[in-house]
Swiss-Prot record:
Stored InterPro entries: MEMO1_fam (IPR002737)
Family: Belongs to the MEMO1 family.
Top-level taxon of origin: Archaea
Protein name, per record: MEMO1 family protein STK_20620
Pfam families attached to this UniProt entry: Memo
Length: 284
């Protein structure tokens, strides 16, 4: 079972060479980390287990996303990356997992970790096996070429799309993922929460609203993050994935570090109506 790319040629370049150059551009951009990381040949104990990464078109959010992938790649090739994304299409279940096969992009195919995927379905009470939610969803797909650029086909993924974004759902998810990470202690597992921040307001307003959410992220306050999103109308699309990694960070005693915060106005130059982007690592 192969999932074909839904947004190649739109959110990112549709040809292999152009896509590789676009990823390199993201790292070397003034808003990016400034250099392309080297993947170490030998594995060592991973410091940063969890990340928040944006998922817009690479021309807008690629440089911000590159900060997270700089740390991820610098610590070696992970065995499995669990990617949590919000559901923008309305298709599928409340929480939908793609169970097996491969995902295809212009950089090739990446394999699903079927063993961990099926164990996650068993361990978490809220995850359904449901491919429909993934067919046209971009929030997970745009993370895959970054992984392929550095790790080729040596890394496997577990894609999970969340439509019902509540603290309770995130609690179940975090508990299930935590059990899996403890069960497979010999495996190098990383979790990515895919989310953009506030949408379609002026640059200054977006920075102000994003900072309210970032304050809760830095205190690992997942319920506070939910309340800010609901009460202050901070239109971060992936607050469910973010709440989940905040809980995981607390369970595994990892601290949050903001790597980069910017908006689409910083890359496009148009600051009248922007989207906020945030890269966070959770490590020691």
């Amino acid at each position: 079972m192969i999932r074909l790319p839904a947004v190649a040629g739109a959110f990112y370049e549709g040809e292999e060479d152009k896509l590789k150059k676009q990823i390199e551009w993201s790292f070397l951009h003034p808003l990016g980390p400034g250099k392309i990381p080297q993947v170490p040949p030998q594995k060592s104990k991973r410091n940063n287990l969890f990340f928040i990464v944006p998922h817009a078109g690479y021309m807008y959010s690629g440089p911000v996303a590159a900060h997270a992938y700089y740390y991820l790649a610098s610590e070696g090739i992970p065995d499995t990356v669990i990617i949590l994304g919000p559901n923008h299409t309305g298709l599928g279940s409340y929480v939908s997992l793609w169970p097996k096969g491969k995902w295809k992009t212009p950089l090739g195919e990446i394999e699903i970790d079927e063993q961990i995927a099926m164990d996650l379905v068993r361990e978490s009470e809220v995850i359904d096996i449901d491919e429909k939610a993934h067919l046209y969803e971009h929030s997970i797909e745009v993370q895959v070429p970054f992984l392929q650029y550095f790790f080729d086909s040596k890394t496997k993924i577990v894609p999970i799309v969340i439509m019902m974004q509540t603290p309770e759902i995130s609690e179940y998810l975090a508990e299930g993922i935590s059990k899996i990470m403890q069960k497979y202690k010999d495996k190098d597992i990383v979790v990515i929460a895919s989310s953009d921040m506030n949408h379609y307001e002026p640059h200054e307003k977006t920075i102000e609203k994003d900072n309210m959410a970032i304050e809760k992220i830095l205190s690992l306050d997942y319920k506070g993050l939910f309340n800010v999103v609901e009460e202050k109308d901070v239109t971060a699309c992936g607050f469910g994935p973010m709440m989940t990694v905040l809980m995981l960070a607390k369970k595994f005693n990892k601290k949050p570090y903001v790597l980069k915060h910017a908006t689409s106005g910083d890359t496009s130059g148009d600051k009248s109506s922007v989207v906020g982007y945030l890269s966070v690592r959770f490590g020691d």
